[in-house]
Amino acid sequence: MSERKLFTSESVSEGHPDKIADQISDAILDAILAEDPDAHVAAETAVYTGSVHVFGEVSTTAYVDINRVVRDTIAEIGYNNAEYGFAAESVGVHPSLIEQSPDIAQGVNESLEVRGTGDQDSLDLIGAGDQGLMFGFAIDETPEFMPLPVSLSHKLVKKLADLRKSGEISYLRPDAKSQVTVEYDENDQPVRVDTVVISTQHDPEATNDQIRQDVIEKVIKAVIPAEYLDEDTKFFINPTGRFVIGGPQGDSGLTGRKIIVDTYGGYSRHGGGAFSGKDATKVDRSASYAARYIAKNIVAAGLAKKAEVQLAYAIGVANPVSVRVDTFGTATVAERKLESAVRDLFDLRPAGIIQMLDLKRPIYRQTAAYGHMGRTDVDLPWEKLDKVDALKAAVEA
């Protein structure tokens, strides 16, 4: 009998405290970019019972009503009832955004390449907003080229939110978490779902039996393909027995604490940088998107079954200090050819990434819940497959 291998990933709903913080940070970023596409923004948010603190650094000509953006975001998520201990129109909002450090700004606004040579290549002008390493990943086990465990985890909490907002399950509250364990065969192909864990906040009147039945029938079976479920699949639904107190009343939340949920569910490596609240000069965000774009096009081109792209930068320097492609032995061509093709086809300077993916637009709030990668419900430029033919041609040359 072949060895059984399990892999687990999780997701959280838009009403989870950390995701509330992410969405507020990205809503502020979008509001600023809508007025000033060249703004530099690093907006952090902390939420807890009855209170929201927004802090960080900005450089912009825009005026944004932070108080209104915060309240509108909370309302859209679904915190409109004082019984939740956190409601859009009654929370205290405490903004404290200051001007970006001139020491950082000088390296971002004029890269080392420009300062050193005096050349005026417009794509050399912007230096990386910080040092760091970023990863992008793709795999052929789902139509969206994402690992199955995190893909299913996102879809489960998104389905819970849809049922809550439509009123079909009226007792649901905004906070929820999911976790999916997938069994893989000896060829690393997913064959079944071993375990599903869902914890969902609810009104006090809802019974455990009712919650379990609704979640299994209306959420799990509606999301997970029947061929992955069998009589041995285990369901843990609200395993603590009660989840009435949730959201910021139950736990404080901070921007950037769900970086594995935001990416690949632990299936791929992560450089450690968070995304939300950061404009595209911050390579933590933009280079992670570029790396995903590259990896997805490599796999979609049939050049590998899975691909991980690492990029690394020095603060104030436009060109990446390293580019690496790892296909884990699944490539149909030499990895050095893939790396050469990537360098030729993708401009990985910050300004090049911004131009390539059109990242000065207010598109970020929609990424701040249910994953930044592999989304099929929203149109994100790093998910496009417009480099497939060019990659094929480049490796054949």
UniProtKB/Swiss-Prot annotation:
It holds the Pfam family S-AdoMet_synt_C. Its main location: cytoplasm. It catalyses: L-methionine + ATP + H2O = S-adenosyl-L-methionine + phosphate + diphosphate. K(+) binds at residue 44. GO terms for molecular function: ATP binding; magnesium ion binding; methionine adenosyltransferase activity. Pathway: Amino-acid biosynthesis; S-adenosyl-L-methionine biosynthesis; S-adenosyl-L-methionine from L-methionine: step 1/1. Keywords: ATP-binding, Cytoplasm, Magnesium, Metal-binding, Nucleotide-binding, One-carbon metabolism, Potassium, Transferase. It is found in: Cytoplasm. Residues 100-110 are annotated as: Flexible loop. Binds 2 divalent ions per subunit. Binds 1 potassium ion per subunit. ATP binds at residues 16, 175-177, 242-243, 251, 257-258, 274, 278. GO terms for cellular component: cytoplasm. CDD domains: S-AdoMet_synt (cd18079). It is an enzyme of class 2 (transferase). Its cofactor is Mg(2+); K(+). Its EC number is 2.5.1.6. L-methionine binds at residues 57, 100, 251, 282. Mg(2+) binds at residue 18. InterPro entries: ADOMET_SYNTHASE_CS, S-AdoMet_synt_C, S-AdoMet_synt_central, S-AdoMet_synt_N, S-AdoMet_synthetase, S-AdoMet_synthetase_sfam. PROSITE patterns: ADOMET_SYNTHASE_1, ADOMET_SYNTHASE_2. The keyword NAD does not apply. Homotetramer; dimer of dimers. Catalyzes the formation of S-adenosylmethionine (AdoMet) from methionine and ATP. The overall synthetic reaction is composed of two sequential steps, AdoMet formation and the subsequent tripolyphosphate hydrolysis which occurs prior to release of AdoMet from the enzyme. Belongs to the AdoMet synthase family. This is S-adenosylmethionine synthase. It comes from Streptococcus thermophilus (strain ATCC BAA-250 / LMG 18311).
